[in-house]
Amino acid sequence: DQPRSRGLGDVYKRQVHGDEASEDDLEAMYGFYLQTFHEYGNSPALTLEFLRHLAATMPRALVIFLAQHEDRPVAGALCLRGGDTLYGRYWGADATLAGLHFETCYYQGIDYCLREGLTRFEPGAQGVHKIARGFLPSFVRSRHWIADPDFREALARWCREEDAAVHEHARVLAARSPFRATDAD
């Protein structure tokens, strides 16, 4: 018996690590991934072969959350586990059900972290809606080498401006936190 998803009637939740994922699980997750990219007009970078590779070479680091309805997967979230953290990366669905996104992407991840003793859950980029679920803004840094010197300088200027705007936006969002402030804050 699989546990039901909160408030989703006869939708059941399932969590599998890479070494537990069947070919059907990987194909379903890949289909959800493609669906999301097509929905937003983006080109997917990952392949089904890459998911198979992750499952084989990082069997306990790959974590997939699936929502099942009428004996078939209807949504999935692909996460990676490293150290004390679960990183949410991709989500997709071929059903539209109220609460399905939050259950699959956030609530199952939170449950997993609690069960596994992980101290952090990074649910992915974007989404002011995540604040209501207890996810506060955090800063992520990346480095890129730009070959063209003129473009590099223009991009560097833009990044400095964007950095200031992002920090201000994070300050405003943190003020809307569902958590009480403490003396340590």
What are these regions (language model features)?
Residues 1-2, 54-55, 111:
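Short, flexible, glycine/charge-rich loop motifs used to bind or transfer phosphoryl groups or to couple energy/partner
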Residues 10-98, 180-185:
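A conserved beta-strand-loop-helix scaffold within acyl/acetyltransferase catalytic domains
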Residues 1-12:
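Single conserved hydrophobic/aromatic residue that forms the stacking wall/gate
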Residues 146-147, 152-185:
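In a subset of proteins, long, contiguous C-terminal domains/tails are tracked
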Residues 83-149, 156:
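Acyl-donor binding region in acyl/amide transferases
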Residues 23-28, 131-133, 150-151:
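Short, solvent-exposed polar/charged micro-motifs at secondary-structure junctions
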